[in-house]
Curated annotation (Swiss-Prot):
Protein's UniProt name: Inactive subtilisin-like protease SOPT
Species of provenance: Plasmodium falciparum (isolate NF54)
Disrupted gene: phenotype observed: Ookinetes fail to traverse the midgut epithelium resulting in a reduced number of oocysts in the gut epithelium of the mosquito host A.stephensi. Gametogenesis and ookinete development are normal. Growth rate and development of blood stage parasites are normal.
Compartments (UniProt record): Cell membrane
Physiological role: Probable inactive serine protease which plays a role in ookinete traversal of the mosquito host midgut epithelium.
Origin: domain of life: Eukaryota
Coiled-coil intervals, chain numbering: none
UniProt feature, compositional bias: Polar residues: 791-803
Keywords: Cell membrane, Membrane
Keyword Membrane: yes
Biased composition (Low complexity): 869-882
Composition bias type Basic and acidic residues, residue spans: 821-831, 855-868
Family to which this protein belongs: Belongs to the peptidase S8 family.
Length: 893
């Protein structure tokens, strides 16, 4: 007994030693963080193309909600090769269908390198129900950073951060108004709806105030199978039969895009400026409960895509993966690509099961197989016969002839590999380890299989672009995970909401720029630690920050065009129009200032417009494609500006990247039009006196108002005539009119620069001229001024309006100021030189005296030295030093 006790004690100590050792190992290798973030990566297909390269999953209890998005590469293919590529992909998928039942397990790279002690530790730990420590939360990624980004995303959704309304088309089965979260969302937004006692699930939206607005378009089967009644929908855009509720697809995706469950659980509302266009393509007959198959879904999908294109949406979200390919679908996809519409396919899947299953099986298997529709063989024959008769009578249906290839082709969103505007998202589908029979098999082609019969991890991922994990439980604990039925729906909805919000912040964000921003926000793989071999963390804050920076950069360029003293190419009218589509928030209170300036400029602009109406008939002055004139009556106070002062929308976003406060408001177009107007009326001045493009100026914002502006002459070419245009600064309304000269105007209204050889400055005055010639130059300048007084300041149309006289007087005064300032500068320079000359003369006299005195002293010293030498040698010569002019006595011994 003692011996057995010692052995038992030693075994116990050894087990505890292993437990402590691997507990520390677990802290460094594994994660217990509950996060809801996304992962994004390019070229996932190349990484996981080889056999056996499967994604590492820790345990079956560890698969739940966590999202990692994978985005595939798009190849630029011609339209002719799209059909061939799709067919090749479908043939490849059909070849893999024969190997569906293959349950061989290929271990991943991490599993091959797995330590044997770790396996023993897992086996021993299952005996002890020990909970994991909370300190493990910081072992993966950066827990504080994740929490900060979650708060940042909630702040964006809870506040209206969008600039412009984004139109999104949702194609699916609708939403569930009886759901607690959706019902709570509707109550928070004060949406008025009436319950239909016959059908409690129906919801009639009267106010249309869910977030922004909704528009419903029904492609449901109303009377007979395979027949879509569009008469009511054609007469009224909102069909009577179209409601927010779905009918037979509980795993809806639309409701998850409209709401955010995490925010609603905290009883908070998020505001996003979006306009939803909902097209319902799922449907069934309540009496017969006959389900539709893939050919009907393709017809419904084509009609919904066409309807979304007519509504002018920016994004289309399809509630299921494109199942089969036909010519009509490819044609509509090409049209959407031409309109630059981004299409997102969800992670839900539709498969056509040809097995003989009862309708009851559909409801019994609703837990894991909600997206699979089964049809009786007898019903199929009835439907086919019914279609042949109805297709001859109805012309409003798209012609769709089912062929043998259509029956064989099965692809998981094959269009996304060939069309760059299609983004396909697929997700992990949690399946139980219990196997079904052949008629109830849940393993399909291109579907990720997590578990096999033995409980091993297996991954079969062909054309999969999204997968997700959960870290709700410890990987060593036998605790069931919280499996949500519509996890993949939430994944797709979250990704679509991210794209829509990026577009709402920056309307000019193209597909290429969007891909670059998403790729730039990927965190390095080293920071993920042991999260996954193939996973990349997507930094949400960087995504929105880059979107805002792109928007700020476009506005900053426009600032430079109006405020910078360097010569830059001006923007065209089309670019200016697109710039002003964004309602830039104002950092200071300029509502009253803009209103006062608009009213103050009315009288002056009206006089200019009336006096030169005949000369501007052919010129397009309005910036909004001819929808309004430049100046209207004073009583109406309606000017052609994209965002008037009474429509300024204050936003939470402020562009603080600029170092100065602009005088020119993005909300008002009259200032820019005024510059064009003033330049246009100067083309009739005398071409003998011109100014140069290379004029320099200093704004009163940068330099004091009393500084003197040096004027240079410039030359403007417009239809072969020289233009006399002045670079003015009007102190009356604090508006700075930028230098718009030295440009040629084409027929399309774009501004183009002259060549560099025409930009050489030609000065009225030479700043390095000799002082002796200043009088001659002044006389010449005054003579030129007298000539201009009689000739140059009169326009060819001899206009005597008060405005033109005022402008001429201002030009004369400014020219005189230039002459006086030039003469004063020359005089001041001469005075300074005279003072310097007097100082030099005085210094020369003093130096001359010093030199003479120094020479006399040296001469006397030499003479005294010579006398001393003579006296010492006995020559008898000597010298008597006395006063400066004392007589010198020479003697001999």
């Amino acid at each position: 007994m003692i011996y057995l006790g010692k052995k038992l004690l030693s075994c116990t100590l050894f087990v505890y030693f292993l437990y402590i050792h691997f507990f520390l190992l677990k802290q460094n290798n594994f994660c217990d963080v509950k996060v809801r973030e996304r992962i994004l990566e390019e070229s996932i297909n190349n990484d996981l193309s080889s056999k056996g390269e499967n994604l590492h999953i820790y345990e079956k209890t560890n698969v739940s909600v966590q999202t990692f998005i994978k985005k595939k590469e798009r190849k630029n293919l011609s339209d002719n090769n799209i059909n061939d590529k799709i067919n090749n992909n479908n043939n490849y998928n059909n070849n893999n269908n024969n190997n569906i039942e293959d349950t061989t397990y290929y271990p991943t790279g991490n599993e091959k390198k797995e330590n044997i002690f770790l396996k023993i530790f897992r086996y021993v730990k299952n005996w002890f129900p020990i909970k994991s420590s909370n300190n493990l939360k910081k072992t993966n990624i950066n827990y504080e950073q994740v929490q900060e980004e979650n708060e940042f995303s909630k702040y964006i959704l809870q506040n209206n951060m969008s600039i412009e309304t984004t139109k999104v088309c949702l194609i699916g089965s609708g939403g569930d108004s009886s759901h607690d979260l959706i019902k709570q969302f509707l109550l928070h937004n004060n949406v008025k709806y009436n319950r239909n006692y016959e059908n409690d699930n129906s919801l009639n939206n009267k106010s249309g105030s869910i977030i922004s607005s909704y528009k419903y378009y029904s492609e449901e089967i109303i009377q007979e199978p395979y027949i879509i009644d569009r008469d009511i929908c054609n007469k009224k855009k909102n069909c009577k039969e179209s409601t927010l509720n779905y009918e037979n697809n509980p795993k809806t995706l639309i409701g998850n895009i409209i709401i955010q469950s995490d925010i609603l659980k905290n009883e908070k509302i998020f505001n996003m400026n979006r306009h939803f266009v909902v097209c319902k393509y799922f449907g069934s007959i309540p009496k017969t409960n006959i389900k539709i198959n893939q050919s009907t879904l393709i017809q419904h999908l084509i009609k919904c895509l066409d309807y979304c294109k007519m509504e002018g949406v920016q994004y289309i979200y399809i509630g299921y993966n494109i199942y089969a390919a036909n010519n009509k679908l490819i044609e509509i996809m090409k049209k959407l690509r031409e309109h630059k519409i981004i299409i997102v396919t969800s992670s839900g899947k539709i498969y056509d099961d040809d097995n003989n299953n009862d309708n009851n099986n559909f409801y019994n298997d609703n837990i894991y197989n909600n997206n699979i529709y089964n049809v009786h063989n007898d019903d199929k024959e009835k439907i086919k016969n019914h279609i042949k008769k109805k297709n001859k009578q109805n012309n409003y249906l798209y012609e769709y002839q089912r062929t043998q290839k259509d029956e064989e082709q099965k692809s998981n969103s094959s269009l996304y590999q060939n069309l760059e505007n299609v983004i396909s998202i697929s997700g992990l589908i949690y399946t139980d380890s219990s196997k079904k029979n052949k008629n109830k098999n849940y393993i399909y082609d291109n579907e990720i299989k997590i578990l096999d019969q033995k409980g091993n991890k297996k991954l079969n991922r062909n054309y999969i672009s999204l997968f997700y994990f959960s870290y709700d439980t410890d990987i060593y604990e036998k605790i069931e995970s919280d499996i949500i039925d519509d996890d993949h729906d939430l994944v797709s909805a979250s990704f679509v909401n991210t794209l829509v919000l990026m577009h709402s912040i920056n309307l000019k964000l193209s597909l290429g720029r969007l891909r670059k921003i998403l790729n730039k926000s990927i965190v390095k793989r080293e920071e993920l630690r042991h999260l996954s071999n193939r996973a990349y963390y997507h930094d949400m804050m960087n995504t929105f920050e880059d979107s805002l920076n792109q928007r700020k950069r476009s506005y900053k360029i426009f600032y430079l065009e109006l405020k910078n003293n360097k010569h830059k190419v001006l923007l065209s009218d089309a670019n200016l129009k697109s710039m002003y589509q964004d309602n830039l928030p104002v950092n200071y209170n300029e509502e009253d200032h803009v209103k006062h300036n608009v009213e103050q400029e009315t009288s002056v602009e009206r006089d200019i417009y009336k006096n030169n109406e005949n000369s501007n008939k052919n010129r397009k002055m309005d910036m909004d494609e001819g929808k309004g004139t430049y100046i209207q009556n004073k009583e109406s106070h309606k000017y052609n500006i994209h965002y008037p002062y009474n429509r300024i929308k204050q936003s939470l976003l402020n562009d603080n990247t600029l170092n100065h406060k602009p005088y020119v408001s993005f909300l008002n177009m009259s200032y820019y039009n005024e510059d064009i107007e003033k330049r246009n009326y100067n083309i009739y001045d005398d071409p003998s006196y011109t100014y140069d493009q290379g004029i320099t100026y200093d704004d009163n914002y940068y330099i004091d108002d009393h500084d003197i502006h040096t004027r240079k002459k410039r030359k403007i070419s417009y239809d072969g005539e020289d233009n006399n245009d002045y670079h003015m600064y009007d102190d009356r309304d604090n508006l700075f009119h930028s230098n718009l000269g030295n440009n040629k105007y084409e027929d399309d209204g774009n501004v183009h620069r002259e060549k560099e050889k025409d930009l050489e400055p030609r000065f009225l005055y030479d700043p390095f001229a000799n002082i002796e010639n200043r009088d001659l130059e002044t006389v010449q300048e005054l003579s030129e001024l007298r000539e201009k007084k009689s000739n140059n300041f009169y326009s060819r149309n001899h206009d005597n309006s008060s405005n033109m006289k005022r402008r001429r007087k201002e030009k004369k005064k400014k020219l005189k100021k230039v002459l006086r300032s030039k003469y004063d500068k020359i005089g001041n320079l001469e005075r300074i030189r005279r003072k310097k000359k007097r100082r030099m003369i005085h210094k020369n006299k003093i130096n001359k005296r010093r030199n003479m005195k120094r020479k006399n002293n040296e001469l006397e010293e030499r003479r005294n030295k010579q006398a001393d030498k003579n006296s010492s040698s006995g020559n008898g010569k000597g010298k008597i030093n006395g006063t400066r002019n004392s007589p010198k006595i020479k003697f001999k011994r």
